[in-house]
Amino acid sequence: MKPWLVCLVVLASWAQAAQATPPPSFQALVDATPIGGTLRPAPGIYAGPTTVNKPMTIDGGGKVTLDGGGTGSVLFLATSGATVRGLILQNTGQSHDRLDAAITISGDDNRVENNVITNSLFGIHLRQANRNLVKHNRISSKHAEASLRGDGIRIWNSVENRIEDNDINEVRDLTVMNSPRNRVTGNSIRNARYAMQFVFSPHALVENNSLSSNITGIVLLNSDSAIIRGNRISHSMETSSVGVAVKKSGEVIVEGNEIVHCAVGVLTDSPFNPEEKLILRNNRIAHNTTGMQFYGERGGHIIHGNSFEKNLSQVVVFGSGNATDNDWRGNYWDDYQGFDRNQDNIGDKPYELYAYADRIWMETPMARFFRNSPVLELLDFLERLAPFSAPDMLLRDQAPLFHRPK
């Protein structure tokens, strides 16, 4: 055999052997680390799954990859007081039933920070885990339609966790379920289904997040006493998209947010009890198809100091009732038709919003297809010019701002 042919055969054998060699086990390194110790593995790819069952620190320095091999979850944090940072975690299984996740946390007071999670069905799953910090992680799910992905972060039956400054892209949701007193702050979430949904999770703080190009921004369902503050929610423009939806939740504060370019800016239903109010103040609600939408409105909400700008419809009401029983005061309306003769920045007359031809598509769902069509626009013009019947008043703001808040 010619020498060059022998060399080719040898090289091919080496390449095949290298491909067939599985990555080393990460579990062995974890097991060899003492309680309270620090594991700094050599750069490279290691095989999961791995279970951490003692307080310790794992620091991958951004150069250590933990690969799940496409089966199950990758890293189980079944302890308290541990730190996991600087890892690249990838290739979970595909099971929604088993909640295959890059990191599953079932202990308290852990830190998970500065990790990269990719090609993982669920990103970080906290189950019966309290007072953990999840910070500065970059998370993406499997490449699939939004509803077929897993949650970027999922919190179940867990309290007082902090989810801070994470970059989350192309996941299904960030879900908080049966979990009170959690804080979700400073995160960026893009191209998800529900950027955040809270279900039976009272006393949540949602602050200073950037939510863009998601089907829906923030949803509260049966989650009382939440604070939604200082977030920017934009470009949720599908038919059913909403910036902030508050359903069956009372004593909720929505303040200082910017909600722009959404199908519906804010959606809410009526509180069960009069004392369970929605407080909406100092928000900018602009360039939405509908600024604010009520369903089954009975009043009781406090809506002060907001700026309603360039919305196709400022406020709409579906179902029974109207929005006049809410406390509207000091809001800026860009379609206000009045003066400010004493220059106190308060309009000389109240802002009043009426429904003319809009009543057709508000009361008849099938007619919503024709919303803002030339026919309905002409009918609306004629109704305003010479009403066929008394229009419905949707709201009255007794002290509208004359200039837009800065």
Model-derived segments and spans:
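Functionally critical loop-and-helix segments that line ligand-binding/catalytic clefts
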Residues: 239-243, 252, 266-269, 279-406
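Acidic Gly/Asp/Thr-rich repetitive segments characteristic of extracellular carbohydrate-active
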Residues: 18-48
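Bacterial N-terminal signal peptides
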Residues: 5-13
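Extracellular beta-strand/beta-solenoid scaffold signature
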Residues: 68-76, 96-104, 119-126, 146-156, ...
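Extracellular beta-strand-rich solenoid/capping regions of secreted or surface-exposed proteins
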Residues: 31, 46-59, 66-110, 121-128, ...
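Parallel beta-helix/beta-solenoid
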Residues: 34, 53-54, 61, 79-80, ...
